[in-house]
Amino acid sequence: MKVTYEIENGKKVEVITYDDGVFMKFDENGNEIHFKSSDGDEFWSEYDENGNEIHCKDSNGFEVWNEYDENGKKIHSKNSDGDEWWSEYDANGNEIHFKNNIGSEQWREYDTNGNEIHFKDNHGFEDWYEYDTNGNVIHYKDNDGYEFWHEYDENGNCIHFKNSDGYEQWFEYDTNENCIHCKDTDGVEYWY
């Protein structure tokens, strides 16, 4: 690996070159502005004053443009193939609405801890999540009738899994919280 510095447009850039031909160039803020893979593909990126990637292109002519809100969240993207997508966020920065120009749309709801508790899309799929006080998923269900449950020990390790199809798994851990034993309702058993 070889590291050099250059002046580009009046600004110092770091250049890293590897023996296999990989080449990377970073701006003064540490953002990758140019990448060349060992097979010759190249990528260039531009950033706004907050370090958000606003434009990228590759050596095949594919390009992507991005827009961000005042909190640095990506709110709009479009590419040179004509694909376009938009996102909206709540006051905590969680994505609550997503849509694209090919007809997909999604909505999400969150609890006060920022955990996703509800998802639905415009194709009719919907699911719900419940969490324990540590933020671990303890119950999941979807509108197709599938459900699963998790139980955790005091260290947050999953000790039991059960789903609506009747399948179950049990887990045991050592004092270092490494899983040492697992068994399920199919008769499969592992020791680690």
What are these regions (language model features)?
Residues 28-188:
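Thr-biased low-complexity repeat/linker tracts and other Thr-enriched repetitive architectures
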Residues 1-30:
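N-terminal targeting and processing segments
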Residues 1, 190-192:
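Short amphipathic alpha-helical segments
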